[in-house]
């Protein structure tokens, strides 16, 4: 069985790790980086770029370069968070037929799981290149506060990428695994994981206990905000720069898509620089132009100014921390360690705020960019049965229930319940002779069902006529280890039953997923063909260059007929190189190599003659008689064959 890899599918950056024995290994991608930007670009010729190459061309292709797709995954178009992003993103967010938020690129509608699958495919390929074998199984992380629809959509993304997702695991829990596994401390420890990433914020309170030599990680509570992260910090800087530039130059950059893309890049860079320095220059020449000519942008940004711009965002992370502590039934002083995860936690003001709330210095021995992927790889090893000394007990982040009479939310499973779990409750009809009941499943903490997130609905039909309150309908909620919900309803009188796996009443259908999987496989085949064509071209161009160089140096030694033959073969190959026909390029390359054989022999003969002349001259100079007799002793009488590489 192959390895189960661990993937941190991040809003801004993604990371992949594996276990080698008892050691974890974060794998470098093809560019040599340990994290990959979660950016996907769709080129005019149909090529899809992922990671650093997509990021590099974003300024010139903003409408077809998708970033932060994770903020849209499993979300409805009408949700206020999505509506807010529509005005900020340079690409088009559109409403799918099922009401989900999708993205439109080059006239084609794409689902967020389909876009995220491109990043997962890059992570899969990174692991395969390193391991030298196919990878088909993965543990993928999600924010702890992701709801059922978002978890399901992430799992779908894995399937589209050709991965069997063995487990969806919460990011803070994964970070705790990475932190706690190598700690030798005996006794129980309570840790707080503060995870502020590119697009989401989570906090989890986790107890690490030693139980008979086994490390037990039990999540006591979790809380967060799935629409708060580094992207929002960048936006505050962008808004500030736009305002300052408008004051100085009287030009509004907010409607200029190309300028916005450059501003985004500059804002991210400035934010990172200000974690280590007190001031930075944002310098963007030729940012725009008007009737008076080109305009240049040069603005100084201090750390103090940045902190004042984002103070309210940092403050927003504290309320979930307070709730998580309360839900865990402990006080702040009970926390032994605070772990920071996510790139945004490098910001000094964030660290200061965390220290102020928890009353202790956060740990510095956890890599905020890599800990989550490492934890996912550890969980992969546990699931494959190679590791027996770890037990992970996670929780469901939000309450789950059904709508009952009067639109009330009747909670079946409360938030922070350890998963997997199962719960059944008996309900009855609300009217006389009611032939069917509709079970509407919601997720959230509000008392009125409609104020929560509707996950799905189904009917149980064929209930025999009876007065209200008589039929006995048993509703069962079953949450699996991925945090994904399965709901069943059974009429106890007739034994009639109906079950569904909650796939948000929108989400991707099985047919859509299968189609996307096929498209992805076709893309992979196309990519392979493109690569083979590039390699054939490179080989052909190298042959043309070598033969032309040799002709200019030794062509005069050839008969006119031989020289013309080689020149004709060069022309044929040059013509083939302009086409997309790999077979023709290969054929003409072979023909040129065959035609230029005589030229090679002439060059070889000339070189040998020159060496012989040099040797004779040297021998004459040295008196030459002593070594003459033995001059053939070192020549081996054998033929050397060219080994053709396949």
From Swiss-Prot:
State the UniProt keywords alphabetically.
Answer: ATP-binding, Chaperone, Nucleotide-binding, Phosphoprotein, Stress response
Residue spans crossing the bilayer: none
Molecular function terms, GO-annotated: ATP binding; ATP-dependent protein folding chaperone; unfolded protein binding
Q: SUPFAM superfamilies from the entry? A: Actin-like ATPase domain (SSF53067), Heat shock protein 70kD (HSP70), C-terminal subdomain (SSF100934), Heat shock protein 70kD (HSP70), peptide-binding domain (SSF100920)
Residue numbers carrying Phosphothreonine? 200
What does the UniProt induction comment state?
By stress conditions e.g. heat shock.
Q: What does this protein do?
A: Acts as a chaperone.
PANTHER family given for it?
HEAT SHOCK PROTEIN 70KDA
* HAMAP family referenced in this protein's UniProt entry, alphabetically: DnaK
As for family, the record states: Belongs to the heat shock protein 70 family.
Q: What is this protein called?
A: Chaperone protein DnaK
Name the gene for this chain. Answer: dnaK
């Amino acid at each position: 069985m192959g390895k189960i890899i661990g993937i941190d599918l991040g809003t801004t950056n993604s990371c992949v790790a594996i276990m080698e024995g008892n050691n974890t290994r974060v794998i470098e991608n093809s560019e040599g980086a340990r994290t990959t930007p979660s950016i996907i670009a769709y080129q005019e010729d149909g090529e899809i770029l992922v990671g650093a190459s997509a990021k590099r061309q974003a300024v010139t292709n903003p409408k077809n370069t998708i970033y932060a797709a994770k903020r849209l995954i499993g979300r409805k178009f009408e949700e206020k968070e999505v509506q807010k992003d529509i005005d900020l993103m340079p690409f088009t967010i559109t409403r799918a037929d099922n009401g989900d938020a999708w993205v439109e690129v080059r006239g084609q509608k794409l689902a967020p799981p389909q876009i995220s699958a491109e990043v997962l495919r890059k992570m899969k390929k990174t692991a395969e290149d390193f391991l030298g074998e196919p990878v088909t199984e993965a543990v993928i992380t999600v924010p702890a506060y992701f709801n059922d629809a978002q978890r399901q959509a992430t799992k779908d993304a894995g399937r589209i990428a050709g991965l069997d997702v063995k487990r969806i695991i919460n990011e803070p829990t994964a970070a705790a695994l990475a932190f706690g596994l190598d700690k030798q401390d005996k006794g129980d420890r309570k840790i707080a994981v503060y995870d502020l990433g590119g697009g989401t914020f989570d906090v989890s309170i986790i107890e690490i206990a030693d139980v008979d030599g086994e490390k037990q990680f039990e999540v006591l509570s979790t809380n967060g905000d799935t629409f708060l992260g580094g992207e929002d910090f960048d936006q505050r800087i962008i808004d500030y720069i736009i305002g300052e530039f408008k004051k100085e130059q009287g030009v509004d950059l907010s409607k200029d898509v190309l300028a916005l893309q450059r501003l985004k890049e500059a804002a991210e860079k400035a934010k990172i620089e200000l974690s280590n320095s007190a001031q930075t220059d944002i310098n963007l020449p030729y940012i725009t132009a008007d009737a008076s000519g080109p305009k240049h942008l040069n603005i100084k940004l201090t750390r103090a100014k940045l902190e004042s711009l984002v103070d309210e965002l940092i403050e927003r992370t504290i309320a979930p921390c307070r709730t998580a502590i309360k839900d865990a039934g402990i006080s702040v002083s009970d926390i032994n360690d605070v772990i920071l995860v996510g790139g945004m936690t490098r910001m000094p003001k964030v660290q200061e705020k965390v220290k102020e709330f928890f009353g202790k210095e956060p740990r510095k021995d956890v890599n905020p960019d890599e800990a989550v992927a490492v934890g996912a790889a550890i969980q992969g090893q546990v699931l494959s049965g190679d590791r027996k000394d770890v037990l992970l007990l996670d929780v469901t982040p939000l309450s789950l229930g059904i709508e009952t009479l009067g639109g009330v939310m009747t909670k079946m499973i409360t938030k922070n319940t350890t998963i997997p779990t199962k719960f059944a409750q008996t309900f009855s009809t609300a009217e006389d002779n009611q032939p069917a009941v509709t079970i509407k499943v919601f997720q959230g903490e509000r008392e009125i069902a409609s104020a929560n997130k509707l996950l799905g609905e189904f009917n149980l039909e064929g209930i025999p006529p009876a007065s209200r309150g008589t039929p006995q309908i048993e509703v069962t909620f079953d949450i699996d280890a991925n945090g994904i919900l399965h709901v069943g309803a059974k009429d106890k009188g007739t034994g009639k039953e109906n079950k569904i796996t909650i796939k948000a009443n929108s989400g991707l259908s099985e047919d859509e997923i299968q189609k996307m999987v096929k498209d992805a496989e076709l893309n992979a085949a196309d990519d392979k063909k493109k690569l083979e064509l590039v390699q054939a071209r490179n080989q052909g161009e190298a042959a043309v260059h070598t033969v032309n160089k040799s002709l200019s140096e030794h062509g005069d030694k050839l008969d006119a007929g031989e020289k013309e033959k080689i020149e004709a073969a060069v022309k044929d190959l040059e013509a083939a190189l302009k086409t997309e026909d790999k077979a023709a390029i290969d054929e003409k390359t072979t023909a040129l190599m065959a035609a230029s054989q005589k030229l090679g022999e002439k060059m070889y003969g000339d070189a040998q003659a020159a060496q012989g002349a040099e040797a004779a001259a040297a021998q004459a100079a040295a008196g030459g008689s002593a070594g003459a007799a033995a001059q053939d002793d070192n020549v081996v009488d054998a033929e050397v064959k060219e080994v053709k590489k396949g």
